[in-house]
Amino acid sequence: MYTTTLSVQGMTCTSCVASIQSMLEGVEGIEQFTISLLLERAIAVHDPSIISPDQIAEKIEDCGFDASVISSTEGEHGVMANYLLLSPMQAEQWTKVHNHINELQGVLSVNCSSSPDAAIRVIYDSEITGPRSIMKEILSMGVKCTFQPVDSSTSRILSLQRGSQIRVWKIRFIISISFSLAVMFLPQIFDSCDSMRAAFLVPHYFGICAGHIISLVLSLPVQFGVGRVYYSAAYHALKRGTANMDVLVSLGSTVAFAASIFFMILYSARHADNPAPIFFDTADMLLTFVTLGRYLESKAKGSTSAALSQLLSLAPSSATIIEDNEQIEILADLIERGDLILVKPGEIIPVDGTVVEGSSYVDESSVSGEPVPVHKTIDDELLSGTANGNGRLLVKATKSPRESQLAVIVDLVQRAQISHAPIQQFADRVAGIFVPVIVALSISTFTFWFLFTKYSSKYPSVFDDPMGKFAVCLKLTISVVVVACPCALGLSTPTAVMVGTGVGALNGIIIKGGEILERLNQVDTVVFDKTGTLTVGKLSVTDISIVDNLEELLDIPKNIFWAFVKASESSSEHPIGKAITEKASEFTDVSEIGIESFNAVPGEGVDVVLRWKERTFHALLGNSLLLEHNNVSIPDDFDSKLKLSSSSGLTCVRIAIDGQFVGFLGCMDQVRPDSYQTVSALKQLGKKVCLLTGDQKATARRVAQGLEIDFSDVYAEAVPSQKAEIIQKLKDQKHCVAMVGDGINDSPSLVLADVGIAPINGSGIALESADVILVRKGVLLDTAVSFDLSRVIVKRIKMNLVWACIYNFVMIPIAMGFFLPWGIYLNPMWASAAMMFSSLSVLASSLLLRRWKKPKSLIFSEADDVETESSTNSSVLQKVYTATRSIFGRNKSSNKYQPVANEV
């Protein structure tokens, strides 16, 4: 299967989206198709053997929209596509170039045309080759070649900011407002004095006023210049059997313009003495207000994608590589795996890689949320989009730019913004019947008032118009057509989803789509994996119990004893051994301990013979079995201590030297500093919190006790399949379940849960299975933040929909003349202004989500040994949302995690 991303231009409302969606969903070979009005992007998952990317673009164009393929990649990891522009050549040389490229290692397919200046599209495996290597091969054949990146960061930013679109609509508005104001005010100027009135407002030429001819001429640029956009879109919509906002606008404008010409001809044929009623100003101002609305909408839509633009701007456009001992500056898109990249002080790292030379402090706040610059040296990993400090680094690229963690984050955010929320189905259903209903209501309005004023003598005073009752009925009809606004309904959900998911991404929370947002808001039960999620995922020594007469018993100083412990476990790869080595290093700096023999006993511990000052020592570190097999007895007082520690969830390592028991070390996986606050916050949000782990019950209950999780909600000693069964059991009890985990063994549960949540430092499988990804490393509290954010976004969506419905329910009856008996009616010009306002108000409402701040209860209160963000952090995220700086302060809270007995 291929995943093809397309650019789709010309969509104006949800009716356009619905028509394309319905056209493509039934096409053979297309497995999945989603499209975004705001991003002007479509993503198709399809079988290329049945339908090609270009054929998908053609089908979209058949609907009346401009479409082009941005990228098309196979489902396999590392498979990429790019375009290369070649110089003109003969057909024979084209064949040679095609065949040569096709034979290159890593190239999967080549599509090219024999026409001059055509582009070849190369699909390749980025783990084997890249665009720069392919270009070198083409250049070696004497053919000039230019790289044309597919969907580069720069082009995507420009597209999202809608700069060209905003300029076009601005020009259209200036043209329309200039001519419309002239058409509106010239008749008033002509009527200002008798001589001008006689010259311009009295029929002279074939019964037509000169002023009317001038108004007609001035209206032409508006109707057939600016208005052509609406008429063309309306034509294509009707051609494909649908009706959208363009149809309503075109209908209202056409009726007013055509009626004006009709009356001019009619009065001319009758040689009438009075000037004909004309509505050129109505037609022109209608288009002017709509054009102003489109201009302001374009600017507002550009703001809705500000978060995605900021993420894209993190990656640099160029990079310096070292090739043949020379520094060469290239486009960042041309970087390939294995390239050596020179990163100078202050530069942005262009691609994920590892340090091969140099050291420096790197600011990772923009990508990982780590606020304090991290020291990087040889073999350390670097992330694209992070900022180098004062050092000079030589970096080996481990991924291509489009596979970097930053690119993955951007792709996830964009896919989330393209996806449709289930609540959007309501707007889609309404949009499907909206225009036909409005047209029917407008015809009914005209018919009713025309007949009413004709056969009744008691009609509202508004019909006593110099232009006649027919003209007033026509204006009411136009008002009904124009005031109705399906756009407000259509924009309610996608704008809120786009802004909301963008805000989430900037705060380190990636929500994979509108459907996930809704489910996240419905969750009532949150299940946590223990190891690596609620806990750090790294064992540490928390309990030390050593005999009082250690030095007399062994005839060695205490620091030498710790040196023995350190040396005994230094060769161990077991997590417990590493934890003991780290703890022992705190008590000794002695290193001249010799190891004569080392034996790791599976399931028991280590058996080591040590040498110090020409003396040998036999050391045993392990569980009770190791000591039993070596005939070492444990004193009764220590035996009771061991039982107490073991029952509280500690892993106890017994220590014996030369056959004598000297004590034990208790190890455990430390609870994360913000776990208590996370659990507490979730409970405040009304969520039930459960603990699910494969560890023993004592360990699980010990963690649950410290976090105040009910023992009845603790599920211990569960293998991956049992974890999934527990999730299903909770769902069967009518709970909406969220699973939070980071390991491979959590993947089945993450998939089965209604919402899967995983930290970005989790396993690759867990990240693929998760619906929500927490980008900020080590900040579990973002789990609770994601629930609060989803609640706010869904609430905003509902507010938008309610407002859009209220607007139409109120304004349409007013336009139809329901309140004419009380002198309340709606002029077509003001109807178009109201329609514009309704769409803009929904956009403004969604943009208010950018002001969202974390509740104070969800701001992490840190211990002194935990590094987090400070108020002076200068990341891009904070530059975008300066209002959220306060959330990163070091606020103290009484809800800090309190260790239970034996933890320290």
UniProtKB/Swiss-Prot annotation:
Give the record's family classification: Belongs to the cation transport ATPase (P-type) (TC 3.A.3) family. Type IB subfamily.
Quote the cellular component terms of the Gene Ontology held in the record: Golgi apparatus; Golgi membrane; membrane
Q: Which GO terms describe its molecular function?
A: ATP binding; ATP hydrolysis activity; copper ion binding; P-type divalent copper transporter activity; P-type monovalent copper transporter activity
Question: Binding positions for Mg(2+)?
Answer: D742, D746
Q: Where in the cell is it found?
A: Golgi apparatus, trans-Golgi network membrane
Keywords, sorted A to Z: ATP-binding, Copper, Copper transport, Golgi apparatus, Ion transport, Magnesium, Membrane, Metal-binding, Nucleotide-binding, Translocase, Transmembrane, Transmembrane helix, Transport
> Which SUPFAM superfamilies does the entry link to?
Calcium ATPase, transduction domain A (SSF81653), Calcium ATPase, transmembrane domain M (SSF81665), HAD-like (SSF56784), HMA, heavy metal-associated domain (SSF55008)
Those parts of the protein on the Cytoplasmic side are 1-172, 219-246, 297-431, 491-805, 850-904
The protein depicted here goes by the name Copper-transporting ATPase ccc2
Give the Lumenal, vesicle membrane side ranges.
Answer: 194-197, 268-278, 453-469, 827-828
* UniProt function note: Probably involved in copper transport and in the regulation of cellular copper level. Retrieves copper from the metallochaperone atx1 and incorporates it into trans-Golgi vesicles.
Gene name as annotated = ccc2
Protein residues bound to Cu(+): C13, C16
GO BP annotations of the record are: copper ion export; copper ion homeostasis; intracellular copper ion homeostasis
Look up and give the membrane topology term: Multi-pass membrane protein
Q: What class of enzyme is it?
A: translocase
Principal subcellular localisation of the protein: Golgi
Domain HMA: start-end pairs: 2-68
What PROSITE patterns does the annotation carry? ATPASE_E1_E2 (PS00154), HMA_1 (PS01047), HMA_2 (PS50846)
Which parts pass through the membrane? 173-193, 198-218, 247-267, 279-296, 432-452, 470-490, 806-826, 829-849
Q: Which domain of life is it from?
A: Eukaryota
Active site at: D529
What's the short name of a Pfam family annotated to this entry?
Hydrolase
InterPro entries per UniProt? ATPase_P-typ_cyto_dom_N (IPR023299), ATPase_P-typ_P_site (IPR018303), ATPase_P-typ_TM_dom_sf (IPR023298), ATPase_P-typ_transduc_dom_A_sf (IPR008250), HAD-like_sf (IPR036412), HAD_sf (IPR023214), Heavy-metal-associated_CS (IPR017969), HMA_dom (IPR006121)
